[in-house]
């Protein structure tokens, strides 16, 4: 019953609410956050990539960093709005690192040097936040070096990481960043950040291991520049320190929780709330990697105890190139990934759909109103020239899509693919129209749907000529293979190392797979991953499954380095054939994994 109720709750939260902008800044009164004369409380998400993407893991991407566009920002905040969220926390401002590859866009390039293009994306985030009615918690700097942080500020002056806390020159450099941000005038709205009501609070940083004296100095500096906004202490702890609670320049205290025992989440946050009651607002800034039932008990306690807010880690959003951005959590036990609204079968292992339904249920319990369900907006079909590579920009809240084709731009339309999830594949084309007839021209459109109904149709793309047929194998089984030896393993572990590819075929030297297609093979492409540089895969073809002959394929190595996650090396092989062969054998030369195979064939 509980599971059924959560799903139904999730599916009824897709309504469109007219956002009228913000009338008030968020203020504090004792231990409460206030929006005018009403208390402001929230249950919502960390959306770390809202202003800066670390998950652009397309197979041929040199590095995973890029800036979000307006579609992505709107999709993220619309997803939060549908889930009842009233506030989100983004991640920190990125800082240039010594080993950055060329083309990585960072916010802070050096002392007092800032990347205007990156801040234009933050301008857009604030503009859309005002439109959608979502407040932002913005932390200034990271304790860690994922995106560049305190060590990079110190490195600009050739000083050790610890200098960030007490060296006058390094502190002055950081203050230049704080001043630049607070005094920046939004290029879209014309509103200075210090006057933007979409900002809930400035957070001194993320998971800072800082002295209390540093917090006092930086909090005072922020307030000297901006009397409108609250200051949140970004000190890293699960049990609040006394100095944070008693510091008058700190308005909000926060804690982060990823417990091995879910009971610790309840006991630690209750202790924190007891210590802050009557003194100042308390926000659980990050929590996660616990079962759905534990999240339910935690949120019930959070609501009952008067905690101002709770933000689960974390939410990703639709990708402008189709599908979603994906993020496996390195500290989530090789189980949890960033959540994708409204939840999909691909997240079944970590109970994604029920968890997101629960988050929405409790968020709306705070606001006291559950909106009526609404159908998703129409998706946007992306340009394509091959009917095996169809993708679209997804619709926030959509659970599935129908792809339609016609031989005329005006119809009539027939169903080419039904109930397609845009969360099944990672950084791949979403649909292959296997039933399109070679040599014919087609037009395509896509419709989104959820329990409330079906959207209007997308834009129409076409005419697109269907060429040869394409067999596509995403390696989530061996059903498409004609034959194989017994040394194969479907690998779903540590997806981050493989550009978030959730299903790969793993084996070692001498292992093989054999494909057979109902026509002459014209070309093939194999997407592989190597732990270290190694010899090329071997390829053989024939008209029968006997007497296979060696054939050649060109290798394209796309190594961008191991990065922070130990990325394996992507090597893409492409071969062509004109011999009328219909069998293709692929042999491993060494330990490696295959993520996708495409075989083009025809008459």
Label for each model-derived stretch:
Residues 283-359, 363:
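Substrate-binding cleft of secreted/luminal carbohydrate-active enzymes
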Residues 402-439, 451-457:
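Recognizes extended acidic, P/S/T-rich segments that occur
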Residues 464-493:
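Extracellular carbohydrate-recognition regions
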Residues 497-523, 570:
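Short beta-strands within extracellular/lumenal beta-sheet-rich domains
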């Amino acid at each position: 019953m509980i599971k059924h109720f959560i799903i139904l709750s999730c599916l009824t939260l897709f309504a469109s609410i007219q956002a009228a902008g913000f009338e008030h800044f968020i203020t504090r009164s004792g231990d409460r956050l206030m929006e005018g004369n009403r208390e402001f409380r929230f249950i919502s998400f960390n959306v770390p990539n809202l202003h800066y993407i670390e998950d652009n893991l397309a197979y041929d991407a040199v590095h995973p960093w890029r800036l979000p566009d307006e579609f992505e920002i709107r999709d993220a905040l619309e997803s939060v709005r549908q889930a009842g969220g009233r506030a989100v926390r983004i991640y920190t401002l990125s800082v240039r690192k010594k080993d950055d590859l060329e083309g990585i866009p960072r916010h802070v390039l050096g002392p007092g040097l800032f990347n205007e293009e990156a801040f234009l994306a933050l301008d857009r985030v604030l503009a859309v936040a005002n439109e959608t009615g979502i407040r932002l918690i913005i932390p200034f700097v990271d304790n860690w070096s994922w995106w560049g942080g305190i060590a990079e500020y110190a490195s600009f002056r050739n000083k050790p990481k610890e200098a960030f806390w007490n060296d006058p020159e390094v502190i002055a450099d950081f203050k230049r960043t704080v001043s630049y941000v607070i005094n920046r005038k939004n290029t879209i709205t014309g509103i200075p950040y210090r006057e933007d009501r979409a900002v809930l609070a400035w957070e001194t940083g993320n998971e800072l291991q800082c002295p209390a004296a540093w917090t006092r100095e930086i909090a005072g500096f922020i307030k000297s520049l901006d009397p409108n906004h609250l200051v949140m202490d970004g000190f890293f702890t699960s049990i609040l320190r006394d100095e944070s609670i008693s510091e008058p320049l700190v308005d909000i205290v926060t804690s982060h929780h990823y417990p091995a025992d879910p009971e610790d989440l309840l006991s630690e946050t209750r202790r924190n709330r007891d210590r802050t009651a009557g003194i100042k607002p308390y926000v659980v800034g990050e929590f996660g990697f616990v079962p759905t039932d534990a999240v339910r008990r935690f949120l019930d306690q959070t609501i009952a105890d008067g905690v101002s807010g709770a933000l689960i880690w974390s939410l990703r959003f639709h990708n402008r190139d189709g599908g979603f951005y994906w993020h496996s959590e390195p500290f989530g036990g090789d189980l949890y990934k960033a959540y994708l609204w409204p939840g999909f079968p691909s997240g079944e292992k970590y109970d994604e759909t029920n968890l997101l339904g629960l988050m929405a249920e409790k968020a709306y319990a705070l606001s006291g109103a559950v909106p009526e369900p609404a159908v998703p907006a129409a998706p946007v079909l992306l340009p394509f020239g091959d009917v095996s590579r169809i993708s679209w920009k997804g619709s926030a809240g959509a659970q599935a899509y129908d792809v339609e084709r016609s031989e005329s731009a005006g119809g009539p339309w027939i169903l080419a693919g039904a109930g397609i999830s845009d969360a099944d594949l990672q950084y791949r084309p979403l649909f292959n129209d296997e039933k399109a007839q070679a040599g014919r021209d087609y037009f395509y459109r896509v419709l989104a749907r959820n329990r409330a109904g079906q959207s209007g149709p997308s834009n129409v793309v076409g005419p697109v000529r269907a060429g040869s047929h394409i067999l596509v194998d995403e390696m989530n089984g061996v059903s498409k293979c004609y034959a194989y030896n017994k040394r194969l393993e479907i690998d779903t572990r540590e997806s981050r190392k493989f550009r978030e590819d959730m299903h790969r075929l793993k084996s070692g030297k001498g292992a093989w797979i054999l494909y057979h297609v109902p026509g002459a093979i014209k070309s093939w492409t194999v997407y592989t991953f190597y732990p270290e540089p190694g010899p090329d895969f071997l390829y053989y073809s024939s008209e029968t499954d006997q007497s296979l002959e060696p054939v050649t394929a060109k290798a394209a190595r796309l190594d961008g380095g191991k990065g922070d996650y130990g990325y394996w090396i992507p090597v893409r092989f492409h071969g062509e054939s004109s011999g009328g062969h219909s069998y293709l054998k692929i042999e491993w030369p060494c330990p490696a994994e295959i993520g996708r195979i495409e075989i083009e064939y025809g008459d």
